[in-house]
Amino acid sequence: MENKSNSQILFAEAQQYIPGGVNSPVRAFKSVGQEFPRFIKFAKGAYLYDVDWNKYIDYIGSWGPMILGHCDDDVLEAIQCQVKNGLSYGAPCKQEVDLAKKIIELMPNIEQVRFVNSGTEATMSAIRLARAYTCRNKIIKFEGCYHGHADEFLVAAGSGALSLGQPNSPGVPEDVVKDTLVASFNDMESIQALFEKYKDEIACIIIEPIAGNMNMIFPQDDFLAKLRAICDQNSSLLIFDEVMTGFRVALGGAQSIYNVKPDLTTLGKVIGGGMPVGAFGGRKEIMQKVSPAGPVYQAGTLSGNPIAMTAGIKTLEKISQPGFFDELGAKAQKLVDGLNEAAKAYDFNFHAKCLGGMFGLFFCSDKIAVNTFVDLGKTNLKMFNQFFAYMLDNGVYLAPSAYEAGFISIAHSDEDIEKTIYLAKKFFQEN
């Protein structure tokens, strides 16, 4: 009789009570061909420990929030102090004001901000606000960019970029997504064609300025600046979804790196320090349309709760210290350089890239440009699955999808990075 791990046993039990056994699909490890996910018992610093007491170097960081590493002492202390004063009030608190001020200080394109409970809520609310502000209904998103699971975002491109979006999940009515237009990332021709066809109907463009749900694809040839220009020419708004990149690739987010000003920005992940949180903000004249200042409705029972606000305040205080992002970026660069050198040593078709505390792994030659969702689909996805399994078996926890970016924290040591490179080198040698 096969001896099953505690993770296997828990997964079987979970499937009896939770659809698919998980509360977010990617966690099931199905996309990488694994029979079961690892159930985590606890985490500290750069490490995860599963229910079978296996230790992993964690390069997911709860999908981005844990920029300080798990259970940072200062964040924990701040949360513990607040817990004694209450978990949630359903009323305004000083922590909301303090976190809002800190975000606005660090991201100058945000003049006012509204807190919500998730990235999905943030993007959904930003779209509603853009539609109300412009009195238009159509939005443009990009194939491969993920903005949460609101109905208007769950679309796939039809036959060519000029197609109206088609639902890619059952339960999403075609009428809901008929106003969602899908373009190709890094392709201005597809954007120009949409504006030519729907010139006075487009409320906004929403984009991940660095596409972290296509592994990690950077904007090319001033793509973001060109989007800013075409939005200005057509009185449409530009929304940067920085739920992933905000306070992760740089202190001022991707918009500070590319020096492009969005009208609205969505945030999440890092601003909650590991607690559930989201936010959307931007120009004051637009944000003043949000209720109760204006007519655009948005509300939430736990929005701005003092626990999440406290965790966010302490996290932003720490990452805004001089030299933090230099150190974080150096760690990511050390990892990426080591992986690229290892692949080159064995003539293995692989390359990696990074920015700030975020990195991407591509199973193709560095001579092959990966600038779109279609490009990524042409890489060796099966080889990624093999790499994932090998690294997991040897104590390295990577994102369980070739379409997801990875994250490094300030808690990762040189030894952690060197072990990761060593294991990758062995894989490249053997494959």
From Swiss-Prot:
PROSITE patterns: AA_TRANSFER_CLASS_3 (PS00600)
Annotated metabolic or biological route of this protein: Porphyrin-containing compound metabolism; protoporphyrin-IX biosynthesis; 5-aminolevulinate from L-glutamyl-tRNA(Glu): step 2/2
GO molecular function, one term: glutamate-1-semialdehyde 2,1-aminomutase activity
Residue positions where N6-(pyridoxal phosphate)lysine is found in the record: K269
Localisation: Cytoplasm
EC number: 5.4.3.8
Any one GO BP annotation for this protein: protoporphyrinogen IX biosynthetic process
Listed GO CC annotations: cytoplasm
Signal peptide: none
Reaction(s) this enzyme catalyzes, per UniProt: (S)-4-amino-5-oxopentanoate = 5-aminolevulinate
Keywords for the protein's UniProt record, in alphabetical order: Cytoplasm, Isomerase, Porphyrin biosynthesis, Pyridoxal phosphate
Cofactor(s) the record lists: pyridoxal 5'-phosphate
SUPFAM superfamilies: PLP-dependent transferases (SSF53383)
Major place of residence: cytoplasm
Top-level taxonomic group: Bacteria
Family: Belongs to the class-III pyridoxal-phosphate-dependent aminotransferase family. HemL subfamily.
Quaternary structure, from the entry: Homodimer.
Protein's recorded name: Glutamate-1-semialdehyde 2,1-aminomutase
Lineage: Bacteria, Pseudomonadati, Pseudomonadota, Gammaproteobacteria, Thiotrichales
Gene behind this protein: hemL
